């Protein structure tokens, strides 16, 4: 059975804040820790484009300084009610590079009434990795990439420990000024930007490609913008190099930044999108990245969780699951019952076919534990209500693609199967998602009595789309309710072109 994992409770409620003075945007995040869980209660993001104010002599101009100070004046009021020891304020690449950084930091500290730390590139990379590790799925070795305004961090790590990290002086703002200064989007400009980025990445690539990483995660910024574009264009998938090439061509077809209109591209990112895209293409090519998923956190989340050291010892996925189970009053015994049956089926399935690649077992566990979320609203359409809810609540410990997979499983765990949801999956993952749906549907049917110790030993035999579920002789006849439900399930799967035999 799945056991409960909860965070230790420090105080009834505490507020924490992290301020990240990035080269493109300034960020403020405020969280509260209550009953052992971390809840975001405030986020502020302002485009400051501090790096755009750097001249050839590495001096920040007055306009960029003023933009930064005005932004901090809005942040200062939000920080007044938070204990000083619970606040961290850091600045990154631009203030590392600027020769007159002290002009900015002295006044910034006066405005915030708090110490501002200009952290090194290595420390920034470490904090980014921690933010990603706390909020995203753990699948062994992970390659983490963050493209900022003036620097790009590359980190390889395992679980909560960064193994090797580097910070490169290239970012979407500085590359925009350097390679797209005339706002022209040409093949030549893209080639120059990609070549420049590859020259920097190639110098350190050997230290990363030697690691056998299980997943590549992109932290915010350009990867997030690309994911939003893919979703808007009907693609529910990880970021892949062929998608990046296609987006590069879409940019070139627009000719100039003024004319850059891509379905799904937020206006606030339009100016720096091509330069960030060029850097990401270079990273994919130099590091031989197959695909990239979006992480749930980055630098500011690393700062927050760094102040909550006790969280390092806890399973973030199970914490997420149990928080939602409590909030939506899910029957924990039935959830564990369905999960146990689902895992039994999954184990037999995995012995006969390839279900690796997207951490399907973790998605199956989450969906099985949370499949009755929608009962919080009503019974008839609870599978649809549950899928909607899980698409809009925090799923700490899971990537965005895994959250989408959990939604798909919950949506299809009963009644008719929605074939269109699989069309958005990449061909490599589509078959796995179909198999997981079939497993969860069978687990729900076999647990329909909501009682323990009713099921006998059973065997799942799999040959492509033909599944055979074998019970002891006479068992189905002695259990007409489950027999009838399985008969209906045969028909539902038949409509999908899947063959199910139960005997």
From Swiss-Prot:
Xref: Pfam families: Ppx-GppA (PF02541), Ppx-GppA_III (PF21447)
Extract one GO BP annotation from the record.
nucleobase-containing small molecule interconversion
- MF terms in GO: guanosine-5'-triphosphate,3'-diphosphate diphosphatase activity
> Which reaction equations make up its catalytic activity?
guanosine 3'-diphosphate 5'-triphosphate + H2O = guanosine 3',5'-bis(diphosphate) + phosphate + H(+)
InterPro entries tied to this protein: ATPase_NBD, GppA/Ppx_hydrolase, Guo-5TP_3DP_PyrP, Ppx_GppA_C, Ppx_GppA_N, PyroPPase_GppA_Ppx
Q: Which Gene3D superfamilies match?
A: 3.30.420.40, Exopolyphosphatase. Domain 2 (3.30.420.150), Hypothetical protein af1432 (1.10.3210.10)
Q: Which SUPFAM superfamilies match?
A: Actin-like ATPase domain, HD-domain/PDEase-like
Per its UniProt record, what CDD domains does this chain match?
A: ASKHA_NBD_EcGppA-like
Keywords carried by this UniProt record: Hydrolase
E.C. designation(s): 3.6.1.40
Biochemical pathway = Purine metabolism; ppGpp biosynthesis; ppGpp from GTP: step 2/2
Q: What does this protein do?
A: Catalyzes the conversion of pppGpp to ppGpp. Guanosine pentaphosphate (pppGpp) is a cytoplasmic signaling molecule which together with ppGpp controls the 'stringent response', an adaptive process that allows bacteria to respond to amino acid starvation, resulting in the coordinated regulation of numerous cellular activities.
Q: Which PANTHER family match?
A: EXOPOLYPHOSPHATASE, RETROGRADE REGULATION PROTEIN 2
Q: Which family does it belong to?
A: Belongs to the GppA/Ppx family. GppA subfamily.
**Protein name in the entry:** Guanosine-5'-triphosphate,3'-diphosphate pyrophosphatase
From which lineage does this chain's organism come?
Bacteria, Pseudomonadati, Pseudomonadota, Gammaproteobacteria, Alteromonadales
């Amino acid at each position: 059975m799945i056991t409960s994992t909860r965070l230790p409770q420090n105080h009834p409620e505490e507020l924490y804040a992290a301020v990240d003075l990035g080269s493109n945007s300034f960020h403020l995040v405020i969280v509260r820790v209550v009953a052992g869980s971390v809840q975001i209660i405030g986020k502020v993001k302002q485009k400051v484009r501090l790096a755009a104010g750097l001249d050839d002599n590495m001096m920040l101009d007055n306009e960029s300084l003023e933009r930064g100070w005005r932004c901090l004046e809005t942040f200062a009021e939000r920080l007044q009610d938070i204990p000083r020891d619970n606040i961290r304020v850091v600045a990154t690449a631009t203030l590392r590079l600027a020769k007159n950084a002290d002009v900015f930091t002295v006044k910034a500290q006066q405005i915030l009434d708090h110490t501002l730390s200009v952290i090194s590139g290595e420390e920034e990379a470490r904090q980014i990795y921690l933010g990603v590790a706390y909020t995203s799925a753990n699948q062994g070795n992970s390659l983490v990439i963050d493209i900022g305004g003036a620097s790009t961090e590359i980190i390889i790590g395992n679980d909560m420990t960064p193994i090797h990290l580097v910070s490169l002086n290239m970012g979407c703002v500085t590359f925009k000024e350097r390679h797209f200064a005339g706002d022209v989007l040409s093949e030549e400009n893209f080639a120059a930007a990609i070549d420049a980025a590859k020259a920097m990445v190639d110098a350190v690539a050997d230290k990363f490609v030697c690691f056998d990483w299980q997943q590549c995660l992109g932290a915010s910024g350009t990867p997030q913008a690309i994911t939003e574009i893919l979703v808007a264009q009907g693609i529910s998938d990880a970021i892949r190099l062929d998608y990046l090439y296609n987006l590069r061509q879409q940019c070139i077809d627009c000719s100039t930044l003024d004319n850059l209109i891509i379905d799904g591209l937020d206006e606030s990112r339009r100016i720096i999108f091509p330069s960030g895209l060029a850097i990401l293409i270079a990273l994919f090519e130099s590091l031989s990245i197959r695909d990239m998923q979006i992480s749930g956190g980055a630098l500011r989340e690393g700062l927050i969780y760094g102040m909550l050291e006790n969280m390092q010892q806890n399973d973030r996925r199970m914490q997420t699951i149990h928080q939602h189970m409590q909030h939506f009053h899910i029957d924990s015994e039935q959830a564990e019952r369905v999960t146990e049956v689902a895992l039994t089926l999954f184990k037999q399935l995995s012995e006969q076919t390839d279900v690796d690649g997207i951490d399907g077992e973790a998605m199956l566990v989450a969906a099985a534990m949370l499949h009755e979320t929608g009962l919080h609203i009503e019974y008839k359409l609870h599978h649809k209500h549950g899928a909607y809810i899980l698409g809009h609540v925090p799923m700490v410990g899971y990537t965005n693609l895994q959250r989408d997979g959990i939604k798909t499983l919950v949506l299809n765990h009963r009644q008719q199967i929605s074939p269109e949801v699989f069309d958005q999956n990449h061909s490599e993952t589509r078959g796995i998602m179909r198999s997981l749906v079939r497993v969860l549907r069978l687990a729900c049917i076999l647990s329909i009595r909501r009682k323990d110790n009713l099921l006998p030993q059973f065997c799942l035999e799999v040959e492509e789309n033909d599944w055979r579920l074998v019970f002891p002789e006479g068992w189905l006849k002695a259990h007409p309710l489950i027999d009838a439900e399985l008969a209906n399930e045969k028909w539902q799967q038949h409509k999908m072109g899947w063959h199910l035999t139960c005997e």
